[in-house]
Amino acid sequence: MPSLLSTPKLAPVLARLRGLSGCMSCLQRRYSLQPAPVKKIPNRYLGQPSPVTHPHLLRPGEVTPGLSQVEYALRRHKLMALVHKEAQGHSGTDHTVVVLSNPTYYMSNDIPYTFHQDNNFLYLCGFQEPDSILVLQSFSGKQLPSHKAMLFVPRRDPGRELWDGPRSGTDGAIALTGVDEAYPLEEFQHLLPKLRAETNMVWYDWMKPSHAQLHSDYMQPLTEAKARSKNKVRSVQQLIQRLRLVKSPSEIKRMQIAGKLTSEAFIETMFASKAPIDEAFLYAKFEFECRARGADILAYPPVVAGGNRSNTLHYVKNNQLIKDGEMVLLDGGCESSCYVSDITRTWPVNGRFTAPQAELYEAVLEIQRACLTLCSPGTSLENIYSMMLTLIGQKLKDLGITKTSKESAFKAARKYCPHHVGHYLGMDVHDTPDMPRSLPLQPGMVITVEPGIYIPEDDRDAPEKFRGLGVRIEDDVVVTQDSPLILSADCPKEMNDIEQICSRTS
């Protein structure tokens, strides 16, 4: 899905990322990365799937599908290593990281939205219940990243559980996630006096709290008190994002699963496309095929844009009829076991590209192929974006859409493709948004590559045959030391393949 062009300028980020690998090799020699001693998971339903109740989803030792207690513990150690590096000059200071869960949001009285955990909280512990707090606390007299991990969670409550379902409680939280300690949520208040001390540096995202009530009850008074001292609260958001930017092999495997099942859903949706057809039907078909293959939810409201509506980049009304002879642009993805996909394909609903549609489609496809070859270590999304604009400018001229000089080709390219070439991808669709696109890519980063050309029907500068056409082609890409790994490789994008799928009979 396209994102805005603006990116924050964070010059120190690159150096910090480069320094992390060396720090981690040292960390692995000096500190245990094992979670707390394994405790038997209660033989009952918890507030989320466990290896006991959902053995078809989780293996023993896993917190979420495919991700073990050891991996979550390693993430926490990496974060505390970054805290140690950021806090140079505060060697005698204790450090406490506080991360809030999401609350339950309601669409109306007593009618909740499907709960989705805050992804920074989820990344660090895997706990999927609302109204919870994760605390990582350094040991006095011991060097970071040595620390204690604590969860503060809702109490077991038979009355509420009758209505809302089971809760993990403190015993379930420890046994499932592998944190060192767990307490009822209200006991967090007893930790606050220690956090107020001048000797304790608190790391917490007070500018954008994920849970307004917990922030108001506990963290806002603490933040205001610390603001009057020399030891102010420091943000932890960017540190977590720097960790999330580079995926582990286990994370990449989850994203491969999401990419594969989304690709299969696209194929079935293409096959179901007959003219005329309602955008709402294709929306429903795509969601069904994702969910039927194991997706938890859609990653975002999909764009299902027929005809000229494809020129509205984030069109999500999806309520119009697509006529015979028109194309549909479907930008969709799913979330599977905490990781998402984000794929775009454009195809004719009657199964046959017209000559102008084929010209424009092939132009975008050639641009996308060229951009994919650039997805290697050392380049950046900004570099790929510049190449995309150059190629679009040339294609616009070749198609007779513009007659501009080379000097003004970039301006024309931005007119007909007003979005960036891509963004980082992971637990979120627009993942790690504070990480600049100017960062050199490195193995383990996952990005999207999504060039497009959009020609509104009222554009009098373009040849009439192209007016009202919009094409975008988007793939999900893992940067490796060798050639890029295309997570969406199973999703057809060659014109012959698309036409063959749309014309199949069974």
Curated annotation (Swiss-Prot):
GO biological process: one example: protein processing
Tissue specificity field: Expressed in brain, kidney, heart, liver, skeletal muscle and testis.
Domain of life assignment: Eukaryota
Subcellular location: Mitochondrion; Cytoplasm
Cofactor note: Binds 2 manganese ions per subunit.
Binding residue positions for Mn(2+) 1: 342, 423, 450, 474
Transit peptide extent on chain: 1-31
Record SMART domains: AMP_N (SM01011)
Main location: mitochondrion
Cofactor: Mn(2+)
Spans annotated as Interaction with TNFRSF1B: 54-79
Keywords of this entry: Cytoplasm, Hydrolase, Manganese, Metal-binding, Mitochondrion, Transit peptide
Family annotation (InterPro entries): Aminopep_P_N (IPR007865), Creatin/AminoP/Spt16_N (IPR029149), Creatinase/aminopeptidase-like (IPR036005), Pept_M24 (IPR000994), X-Pro_dipept-like (IPR052433)
Enzyme Commission number(s) from the entry: 3.4.11.9
One term under GO cellular component: cytosol
Positions that bind substrate: 300, 331, 342, 423, 430, 450, 474
Catalysed reaction, written as an equation: Release of any N-terminal amino acid, including proline, that is linked to proline, even from a dipeptide or tripeptide
Pfam families to which the protein is assigned, alphabetical: AMP_N, Peptidase_M24
Molecular functions (GO terms): aminopeptidase activity; manganese ion binding; metalloaminopeptidase activity; protein homodimerization activity
Residues the entry annotates as binding Mn(2+) 2: 331, 342, 474
Quaternary structure note: Homodimer. Interacts with TNFRSF1B/TNFR2 (activated) and TRAF2.
Function noted in UniProt: Catalyzes the removal of a penultimate prolyl residue from the N-termini of peptides, such as Leu-Pro-Ala. Also shows low activity towards peptides with Ala or Ser at the P1 position. Promotes TNFRSF1B-mediated phosphorylation of MAPK8/JNK1 and MAPK9/JNK2, suggesting a function as an adapter protein for TNFRSF1B; the effect is independent of XPNPEP3 peptidase activity. May inhibit apoptotic cell death induced via TNF-TNFRSF1B signaling.
Family from the record: Belongs to the peptidase M24B family.
UniProt xrefs under PANTHER family: XAA-PRO AMINOPEPTIDASE 3
Protein name: Xaa-Pro aminopeptidase 3
Biological source species: Mus musculus
Gene encoding the protein: Xpnpep3
